[in-house]
Swiss-Prot record:
Pfam families: Ribosomal_S13 (PF00416)
Gene3D superfamilies hit by this protein: 1.10.8.50, 30s ribosomal protein s13, domain 2
Name of encoding gene: rpsM
Native source species: Francisella tularensis subsp. holarctica (strain LVS)
Alphabetic keyword roster: Ribonucleoprotein, Ribosomal protein, RNA-binding, rRNA-binding, tRNA-binding
Purpose: Located at the top of the head of the 30S subunit, it contacts several helices of the 16S rRNA. In the 70S ribosome it contacts the 23S rRNA (bridge B1a) and protein L5 of the 50S subunit (bridge B1b), connecting the 2 subunits; these bridges are implicated in subunit movement. Contacts the tRNAs in the A and P-sites.
Protein origin, superkingdom: Bacteria
NCBIfam families for this protein: uS13_bact (TIGR03631)
Record bears the keyword Translocase: no
Protein name: Small ribosomal subunit protein uS13
Ranges where the record places region Disordered: 91-118
Length: 118
């Protein structure tokens, strides 16, 4: 298994698809990384040479991925909650943040229905 950014990349997948298993790298960024490293995106990870894997590692290291990105996102949400702005209050109450309706929808965000006790 190739290990890039602290993640074991599945060896039986194509390079582009394998890179997307890293948190913070989507399909477009994976294609850009392959193009920068001169790696064919359709080659499977197990067929890459050690130099190619090392070049992928150095290229991925230029981006904020995995734990650093997760920490950054959670700190951004925490900052919004500390400010007490509208978005922060919505996060704190576990309600939709981006203006969606909540009268009939938003069950995923609100959780299971709570019956009214008489």
């Amino acid at each position: 298994m190739a290990r890039i950014a602290g993640v074991n990349i599945p060896v039986h997948k194509h390079t582009v698809i394998g890179l997307t298993s890293i948190y913070g790298i989507g399909k477009t960024r994976a294609q850009q990384i392959c193009q920068t490293c001169n790696v064919d995106p359709t080659v499977k990870i197990k067929d890459l040479s050690e130099e190619q894997v090392e070049s992928l590692r150095t290229e991925v290291a230029k981006f904020t991925v995995e734990g650093d990105l997760r920490r950054e996102v959670s700190m951004d949400i925490k900052r919004l909650m500390d400010l007490g702005c509208f978005r922060g209050r919505r996060h704190r109450r576990s309600l939709p943040v981006r203006g969606q309706r909540t009268k009939t929808n938003a069950r995923t965000r609100k959780g299971p229905r709570k019956p009214i006790k008489a």
